[in-house]
Regions:
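A structural signal for isolated positions on well-ordered beta-strands in alpha/beta enzyme cores
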Residues: 52, 130-132, 290
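Short beta-strand-to-loop capping motifs
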Residues: 64, 192-194, 259-261
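Histidine/acidic-residue-rich, glycine-tolerant segments that coordinate divalent metal ions
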Residues: 60-61, 82-84, 88-100, 106-115, ...
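Metal-dependent amide/peptide-bond hydrolase catalytic core
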Residues: 210-389
């Protein structure tokens, strides 16, 4: 038997599928979500929400107060797209060259709007609902900027929830994990400086490219020799930018790294070792290495009690077979900044399907699975009515 909430929401499913596809056609990257945020604000205003714009530039918060309840619930969706070219071949594919909703944030935004319309119309809760539409998740600091701009000072929350669609998991299955669920992320640049010169007389130079290669190799010892094998960590040198000519020894190299961990102490150890190794390796060649921490986000940790509520609501809506535990993974999510401020919160996944030909996120052929809109909206509504009762 279908749950009554699903039946009530299904009436408007086609409307929100169409909205999701319109968002998909007009993708906007981090901190440039002007058209998206304007449409979000317009719809929330039409449905009776108090609308606030401007946090983190393009962020939107919609507030709905119902009854005399004192509790305050936050639901968050991300809005930004990726700087990628889409190759899905869908009729609603991106109309913006080099911009693409390749992670499903068009679907996340629409899912929360789908729930917002129902909750404002039915109003079967008592308390304050804060709907948070966040920019720049793909940059991994849009959430941090919203918090720094006073998100929780202006819009207090006693609990907060976020979700993400997940290709590779069974369709509609809710994935939960207590504690550490997603990795911290740190982006670092290492600038190596040596002495340039002609490739025919290397004895008069300090080869910055050679130094960068030694640093790259030495960094791989961190995970295998400085970190216990029981704690996952990743150190990846993703870019080494040196010269262009075959007969010139470079005096300057820029290295770009990413670091992922599931433990803050491990994170600190890895970052310190990167610094120590880079500086020492450079000095051994009479070069210098300067490190810059470009940005970082913390480990995403879920509160077990709040997770239990998600599990309870999801089981009632979809059945126990559609709720399960997931392993932690080394991807990162800046919703972690919000959970860091408000540890009574939960981030969960919704399976987008595990067919062999289903594209993963960040793949040029990816498209959000519209079947998830109803699932996600029902879960948002169920959580709201459960928490604010």
């Amino acid at each position: 038997m279908t749950h009554p909430l699903l039946e009530a929401l299904q009436v408007n499913e086609a409307q929100f599928i169409a909205l999701r596809r319109r968002f998909h056609q007009q993708p906007e990257i981090g901190f440039e979500e002007h058209q998206t945020s304007s449409e979000v604000a317009r719809l929330l205003g039409e449905w009776g929400y108090e609308v606030h714009r401007g946090l983190a530039g393009t962020g939107v918060v919609g507030t709905l107060r119902v009854g005399e309840g004192k509790k305050r619930l936050g639901l968050r969706a991300d809005m930004d797209a990726l700087p990628m070219q889409e190759r899905s071949g869908k009729p609603w594919a991106s109309q913006v060259d080099g911009r693409f909703h390749g992670c499903g944030h068009d679907g996340h935004t629409t899912t929360l709007l789908y729930a917002a319309e129902y909750l404002a119309r039915i109003r079967q809760f008592t308390g304050t609902l804060q709907l948070i539409f966040q920019p720049a998740e793909e940059l991994l600091y849009g959430g941090r900027v919203m918090v720094e701009d006073g998100l929780f000072d202006q819009f207090p929350c006693d609990a907060i929830f976020g979700l993400h669609n997940m290709p590779g998991q069974p369709l509609g299955k809710i994935g939960l994990r207590d504690g550490a669920m997603m990795a911290s992320s740190d982006t670092l640049h290492i600038e190596v400086k040596g002495v340039g010169g002609h490739g025919a007389v290397p004895e008069h130079t300090v080869d910055a490219t050679l130094v960068a290669c030694h640093i790259t190799l030495a960094l791989q010892s961190i995970v295998s020799r400085n970190i216990t094998p029981f704690e996952p960590a990743v150190v990846t040198v993703g870019s080494i930018q040196a010269g262009h000519a075959p007969n010139i020894i470079n005096d300057h190299v820029l290295m770009k790294l990413t670091v992922r961990t599931l433990n803050e102490q491990v994170r600190e150890t890895v970052l310190q070792r990167i610094h120590d190794i880079a500086v020492a390796q450079a000095e051994s060649f009479n070069a210098t290495a300067t490190l810059t921490h470009v940005n970082g986000s913390p480990v995403l940790r879920n509160d077990p009690a709040t997770n239990a509520m998600v599990r309870e609501v999801a089981t009632a809506l979809f059945g126990a077979e559609q709720v399960g535990e997931v392993k932690p993974f080394m991807g990162s999510e800046d919703f972690a900044f919000m959970l860091e401020q408000h540890p009574h919160g939960s981030y969960f996944t919704i399976g987008a399907g595990d067919e062999p030909d289903r594209c993963m996120v960040h793949n040029p052929g990816y498209d959000f699975n519209d079947a998830l809109l109803l699932t996600g909206a029902a879960l948002w509504c169920g959580l709201t009515e459960r928490y604010l009762r």
